[in-house]
């Protein structure tokens, strides 16, 4: 198995990620480029380490999280499936069949809320990705344009975002601080209810409980 550091040397992968980010930026989506996947990858590695997964599993979680969104360079629709297939074409020789299958499953599962997670790599990837809510993800600069889109509004209003793991209490907690002068907290739930369901299911697969704290109030 190659490492994330080695995988990042593939020029096709990096180009696809950069084009995915640029394509969605032009469509006024939140960031899905290198900044997003670098953060999600680091978060996935940390979750995997904190819950006690093996070194190899930690590496796989970091890799799946880094690669989960690059299919967007082709299309937003079915980007998870396209990303998984292209990943297989790029890296088939670098992983065992079992490793490759788990990585492809994680890339596909990150965007299918009805899927059941059969391995920890998919579950960790979901938690790392769906918890990435923060002001820095807003690519639009015009505040009037930001105010017109609920996803941009909620991300822009999120001044602080941290995902923590308490191994002793078996809790995985997302802590957010939202500027309620810009958006009411209810708008967060209007767009992220499905994501929180993802996170709860993923945490349960790992033997943990998912908690959500917004502005010092525990909501889940």
List each model region and its residues.
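Terminal helices and disordered tails flanking the catalytic cores of nucleotide-processing hydrolases
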Residues: 132-220
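Aromatic/hydrophobic pocket-lining residues that form π-stacking "cages" and hydrophobic walls in ligand
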Residues: 44, 124, 199
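Alpha-helical structural motif
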Residues: 9-12, 16, 99, 120, ...
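Non-transmembrane, amphipathic alpha-helical segments
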Residues: 29-32, 116, 187
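Acidic/His-rich, divalent-metal-binding segments that scaffold phosphate/diphosphate chemistry
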Residues: 1-78
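Divalent metal-dependent catalytic cores for phosphoryl transfer on phosphate-bearing substrates
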Residues: 25-26, 49-165
């Amino acid at each position: 198995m190659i490492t994330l550091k080695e995988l990042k040397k593939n020029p096709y992968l990096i180009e696809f990620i950069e084009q995915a980010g640029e394509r969605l930026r032009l469509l006024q989506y939140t960031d899905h480029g290198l900044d997003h996947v670098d953060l999600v990858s680091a978060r996935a590695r940390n979750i995997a380490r904190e819950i006690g997964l093996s070194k190899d599993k930690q590496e796989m979680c970091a890799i799946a999280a880094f690669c989960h969104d690059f299919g967007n360079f082709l299309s937003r629709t079915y980007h998870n499936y396209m990303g998984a297939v292209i990943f297989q074409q790029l890296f088939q020789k670098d992983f065992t069949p079992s490793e490759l299958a788990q990585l492809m499953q994680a890339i596909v599962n990150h965007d299918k809320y009805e899927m059941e997670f059969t391995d920890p790599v998919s579950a960790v990837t979901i938690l790392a990705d769906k918890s990435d809510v923060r002001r820095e993800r807003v690519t639009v600069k015009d505040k009037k344009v930001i105010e017109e889109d609920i996803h941009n509004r909620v991300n822009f209003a999120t001044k602080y975002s941290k995902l923590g793991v308490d191994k002793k209490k078996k809790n995985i907690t997302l802590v957010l601080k939202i500027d309620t002068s810009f958006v009411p907290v209810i708008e967060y739930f209007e767009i992220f209810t499905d994501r929180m369901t993802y996170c709860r299911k993923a945490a349960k697969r790992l033997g943990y409980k998912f908690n959500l704290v917004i502005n010092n109030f525990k909501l889940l």
